[in-house]
C-alpha cells in the first residue's frame, strides 16, 4: 500500500493516525503528534511495538516511564496500560500490532 493512499485520521488534540499495511496477524500504523499531544493511558489485548521515527516522547507502560527519541523503541505486552506524551515535536511513532487492530479499520 502506498503511504498517501491510506486514510489519515484526525485523532484530535494534535495527533493523527494512518494505517499503513495489515493482514490478520500484523498491522503497521503511523501516528503523528504535535508537541504536547498525548496518547492517553489505555490498554488492549494486542501486543504493540512502538518505534520513534522523530521527536521525543515520554512513554509509560504500567508503572514504568522512559523518555524515548529517534531510533528508540518499546514493546507493550497485551493488556498493559500504556500511554505517551510528545515532549518535543513534531513527533512520529511507527506502531506495530499483533494481531491486527480491527477497530482501526472501522
Where are these regions (language model features)?
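Short acidic-glycine-tyrosine-enriched beta hairpin
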Residues: 64-78
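Short beta-strand His + acidic residue motifs that chelate non-heme Fe in jelly-roll/DSBH
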Residues: 39-41, 59-60, 76, 82-88
Amino acid at each position: 500500500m502506498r503511504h498517501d493512499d491510506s486514510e489519515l485520521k484526525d485523532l484530535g488534540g494534535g495527533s493523527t493516525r494512518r494505517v499503513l499495511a495489515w493482514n490478520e496477524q500484523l498491522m503497521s500504523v503511523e501516528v503523528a503528534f504535535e508537541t504536547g499531544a498525548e496518547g492517553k493511558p489505555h490498554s488492549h489485548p494486542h501486543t504493540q511495538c512502538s518505534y520513534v521515527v522523530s521527536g521525543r516522547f515520554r512513554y509509560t507502560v504500567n508503572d514504568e516511564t522512559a523518555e524515548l527519541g529517534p531510533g528508540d523503541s518499546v514493546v507493550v505486552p497485551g493488556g498493559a496500560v500504556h500511554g505517551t506524551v510528545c515532549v518535543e515535536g513534531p513527533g512520529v511513532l511507527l506502531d506495530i500490532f499483533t494481531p491486527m487492530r480491527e477497530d482501526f479499520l472501522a
